[in-house]
Amino acid sequence: MLSIINLTSKTIKEVNKGVDLVIGFFDGIHKGHAKLFKQSDRFNLLTFDHIPKKQRLLYPKVDEIEQLSALSGLEQLLVYDLLNNNLSAQEFIDNYIKLIQPKRIIVGSDFKFGSDQVDYSLFAKNGYEVVVVKKDHCSTSEIKKLIINCDLDQANKLLLTPFYLKGTVIKNAQRGRTIGFVTANIILDNQLIELTEGSYVCKVIVDNKTYQGICFIGKPKTFDEKQRQCEAHIFDFDQDIYGKKIKVELYQFIRPTVKFNSINELKEAIENDKKAALSFFHKQEKPKVVVALSGGVDSAVCAYLLQQQGYDVVAAFMQNWDKDLNFELLSDHADDQIQGCDAKQDYEDTQKLCEQLKIKLYHFNFVEQYWNDVFLKVLEDYKKGLTPNPDVLCNQFGKFGWFINALRKQFGDDIKIAFGHYAKLITKDDEVFLVHTKDHNKDQTYFLTMLKKEQLKNIIFPLSELDKPTVREIAKQANLYVANKKDSTGICFIGERNFKQFLSNYLAIKKGPIILIDENKKIGEHDGLYFYTIGQSRRLHVGGTKEKIFVCDKDYNNNTLYVCYESSKDQYLSSVSCELEKFNWLIDTKDQLFNKKLWIRFRHRQKLQECEIVSYHDDKVIVKYTKQIGVTPGQYGVIYDQNLWVVGGGKITKIIK
């Protein structure tokens, strides 16, 4: 516990010996003082009372002591009273410093002491190690000038806490109540700096609760009173606080004092003061944003950038998979080790990142919803012979479904929500549009194509103008906890798995023949049709063929996998048109897009291909394109206009060769 010692020849024996000693005049703790305190993690502090110079103070000595008492690392606070005891600098060293025996003496570069006002070099001449800290033009005298000249914004930037007045609320004539503006009045100490008389934007702290308000400082000329005081009108406040101590923080000067000719003039002026204060607070309030953190570097950089932009950032993490609850028995992590996306590790990384950035973290569990709305749909597509895309479903039903609904319920419908997707949103005529980003390799609009416009309301994509190398560099420069973490791969929210083992938990897997369609002969055995994708050429485990082979068809009725030679890909794998089912339009002018040159992508990172919409009916769209290899049913076709705004997308159901 901090001990406070009024330093005299008798009490000096109570001072701890051999610790650092910070010496200074601490009337209002500012950033220059903070530099002094950072020089040691264990120190005593020596300050002075009753400075001989006739100068007004920022705060009473009791407030100075209260502020200093909160310092980390401070062991003893020594107060030396200069009244009738102002020794020369050398006498002070001989009578006090030599008895204190400090390890080091820490002072500011402008420090002078003693009746002869000698600088800090005298300590060194007496054999003490002196640490001199430059305060960069941050001084109490400069802060006083700023406050007197009504530049409270700059003064508060230099102070560690906003400039304030304190006092006990007094009884008065209660004339404010008669005109609808109740005030809490405190008497101002005449020893403190004399503020410019007038109206100020303020905050009032009552019983450790903070309220917005306005205050008048001066001798109220309106009613011919002479006592200098602070009259604070607290917004939306009707408690009886007479006799209570309050703190009034000053933020902005509104207008000088004037004499009003009538009550109505006074009321109008106060109303205008209140409007000015409310406008000030509205501009000062940090907009709140929830960042969806995944444990990866992209979302971490989102949180960091939004903090740097002045947002009030909170974080949310959602768990969508539980290995035990979901009966995942057979699947080991890929390569027999945890890599990339692992729910437990990701949550731990997210917690450590939030501790580093000092932001609050909320945890949401959507294991049941993920199973029903995403995973069962994935299994259903596999059973139909399709190649599903879990990432599209994750965004459609998960991140921008149950997740944002839960966040809006928690924080309000207008809460801004940020994601680490490489995507861009443009608002035009109060409508939001999804747009391709500058990083063509990383762009993730493909995975967002099934989102409705209402799902994109108040969504922020902070990485929209950045590429991946830049994001990595930002993370490293900011020393973010996950800066060197690998990108996640594998199944959305499930992570790296031995895919064959994993899928075997939920689907009946049966081996069968691999038929080379060019020669109509069996060349091997597949491990189960679900494990293969149209156009796949790797991991077929078939050797001895004269050419590279590709998966070209899957016959679920006969459990047969068909492959073809590379030279016959055009015959078996090419297409010039396809049908997109449950097409989600993100641009309303679809009639104007009919038979117009557009762009399409059938898989993430694929180079954009020319196309045109040849017909649409209900939720089905037929699209024609330049010849493509490996367009796969179950995946999605995403269409862009000439400006790379997303027109919409749908699931590929039919291929037209």
UniProtKB/Swiss-Prot annotation:
Its EC number is 2.7.7.2, 2.7.1.26, 2.8.1.13. Residues 283-657 are annotated as: tRNA-specific 2-thiouridylase MnmA. It catalyses: riboflavin + ATP = FMN + ADP + H(+); FMN + ATP + H(+) = FAD + diphosphate; S-sulfanyl-L-cysteinyl-[protein] + uridine(34) in tRNA + AH2 + ATP = 2-thiouridine(34) in tRNA + L-cysteinyl-[protein] + A + AMP + diphosphate + H(+). Pfam families: FAD_syn, Flavokinase, tRNA_Me_trans, tRNA_Me_trans_C, tRNA_Me_trans_M. GO terms for biological process: FAD biosynthetic process; FMN biosynthetic process; riboflavin biosynthetic process; tRNA wobble position uridine thiolation. The active site is at 394 (nucleophile), 492 (cysteine persulfide intermediate). NCBIfam families: PRK00143.1, ribF, trmU. This is Trifunctional protein RibF/MnmA. It comes from Mycoplasmoides gallisepticum (strain R(low / passage 15 / clone 2)).
